[in-house]
């Protein structure tokens, strides 16, 4: 196992450098001149533009800019934002903890609720509960996220008053609970349907019939032989979904006025703030890489047939 982890860590190195190079190249190739646009209605003089470009190393060749960016990344010196006095690192440190907390809560919601409802639906395949949750999951998948957000805001926040309608500057568990449900709603539906299909299929498998013939209790058969095997594809989906949740929280953060990664990254893209865009997306790449590694390590725990040399 240790050799496998070491090998995967070595494989992550070229993936990381390749992804960051691609991101930097895409930002470098964006049309327009964000430096010239800093003056707004008034045009900046060529001398001022050259001075600003020199301060951001924009006067150097692309590969030199990229190497300087990597140097700053490894020394935690990400430079200044093009459209503000704050450093990129300060903005990143302020925004990422909020989105990480929101994404983990959304992941927990879709995992607990999706696996729970999917397990019941798979065991009772063809019954009224199975039909009901399948229809509801299709509705959740079909309805846009912002509609789900506004509906929950009105029902849970306004009519019932159970949860806050919006989040503050430093949102806690209560303020993030409803946004987490909205963010994880679509993934919850997919986890439910995936779990339901896997459980229903494993219930008719030969190894399950053999376990029952040996006299094992129903609970042991369900947990060890059915649920454990059914969770392998579910864990794959959840692991890949963590990065997608963090990168796709723009709509949810906008609905609930959350100052996280989504809104900050969207604003940086609109403004052409290259240092901000590159730094934020680089962290997202790291999240994807690490989450995929953790998923691979969980396989061996869930499926005894999987062994890493």
Model-predicted segments: where are they?
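Hydrophobic aliphatic residues
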Residues: 26-30, 38, 42, 73-74, ...
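Alpha-helical transmembrane segments of integral membrane proteins
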Residues: 2-4, 90-129, 145, 169-309
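An internal, D/E-rich "acidic patch" concept
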Residues: 59-115
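Juxtamembrane/transmembrane-helix interface segments of polytopic membrane transporters
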Residues: 19, 23, 27, 149, ...
